[in-house]
Each structure stands twice: as structure tokens, then as C-alpha cells.
Amino acid sequence: MAKMTILKMKARLEKELDAPNRQFAYNRDNDTLSVTQNGKKVTLTIPQIVANYENDGDAAVEKIVYYVEEGFRAAAGNVELKNNQANIYPVVRATSFPSKTKAGEVLLTDEHTAETKIFYAFDLGKSYRFIEEGMLEKAQLTHKEIREAAFRNLANLAIPLKKDAVNGNDFYFVRTNDGYDASRLLNEAFLREMREKITGEMVLAVPHQDVLIIGDIQDNTGYDVLAHMTMDFFADGLVPITSLPFVYNNGKLEPIFIMAKNRLKE
């Protein structure tokens, strides 16, 4: 099989994503491909897609195409908040994530940690659309009502855990791919339940949207494994959040920086 290059991947993505009213713009300086449709834009980092392709083959490209198509579909979808509060969920994003749409609409958010911010989304089935502040007046709902509905719905989501162990350190993974895996970090009842179960230090990570990692850390090896694991997930995620894990103590999440086999407290 011929080696996949950045230009070959660019051409393939343009071919597979080609559609009426859709434009492409390639930035040679940082090797990104912007896809625009009806004023909505998605920017793809081609070297990352090539790296994923080398590991996963065509499945990596299919995943990107699906992500873009569903994103445009969500942007075009109608949002009726008033009678559909069961479709509202909180989602976690990096603090650097844009707080406005391309059209300048302010997104509904809440503060979370120094590394993360809470946004609110309206579930559309296979995708979701971020809730804008302007939608609340039309729906005659308050920020508080949206928040309460979102966290109530989050509490009803199942949390299946997969467990792995490395040298006495246990790691639990939430990977349902329902779009809200990282959001489980906001389920305080679940965090308290895990804290009671864990015998070491409880360290969590949300490197990207589709994974939550919980570590029962007993020693420096555990911190080292978690640090490498988090960086790997962060690099592979379609929607990266943060490469910094969080220590959970007394009901609070505190970001920490882990280097090599040492844990450095913030």
C-alpha cells in the first residue's frame, strides 16, 4: 500500500466530503483543511488524520467524514427547547473553546475548572447543537432551568466501566461514544461513589469528548501511566479537551501536572 501523504489525504477528504454549497480552503502553513457550508465551518488538521489513518486505515477517514457530515446536519437542525428539555445535556470543553458561534451568537456556558468549561447542548440523535443564549428567550426558559434539565438528564445516563490494571494501579474507562463520555465528569453522585470505591488517590482525565478515565493511583508508576495514557488520548481525539488530569478530593477537582515518574502538585 502506497504511503499516505498530506496532499493525498487532502484530495481524498475533498472528494469524500464534496457536496453542493460546500467550499474547501487549504492552509499550507499549518496543513489544515477548512470545510464551509452555509456559513458554518469545520477545520480539519490533516497530519493528525494521516497519523490516525496509519493506525486505523480507512476507518479513520470514515470517522472524520461522519463527524463533518453530522456537524453540518446539527448546525442546520431546528432546536425547540421548550417542550424537549429531556434532550438537553451538559458537555465539557477546554476553556479555550470558542464561546461564540461563527455568526457571533453567544453560547450558553458555566465555569467549571481552570482547564474546562461547561457548555449546553441539544441532542439531535447522532449529533448535537450547542445552545445559544438567544435561544432561551424564545423558549421562555432561564439559564438555571437549562442547567437543571441538563444535569438531571446527565444523571440518568448509564455509566458502564471498563477496568484495566497496571502494577497495582487500577484504571476505569467510560467509552460509550454517545457524545457525553467526558460529561460524566460532571456527575457528582458518580464521582462520590467512585471515591468510596477507590483506595488510593482518585485522579480523573478527560483528554477528549469521547472518554473519561478514572485512576486509582497507588504509586508513581500509576501517575506515569496515567500521564502517558492521557497524552495519547488527547492526541487522537476529534474533540480534544485537556491533557491535564484532575485530582478529586473533598468534592473538588484540581488540575495537576504530571511529568515522567513524578507528580507535581499545582
From Swiss-Prot:
Similarity comment text for this entry: Belongs to the UPF0354 family.
Name the record gives this protein: UPF0354 protein LMHCC_0955
InterPro entries linked: DUF1444
Lineage: Bacteria, Bacillati, Bacillota, Bacilli, Bacillales
Domain of life: Bacteria
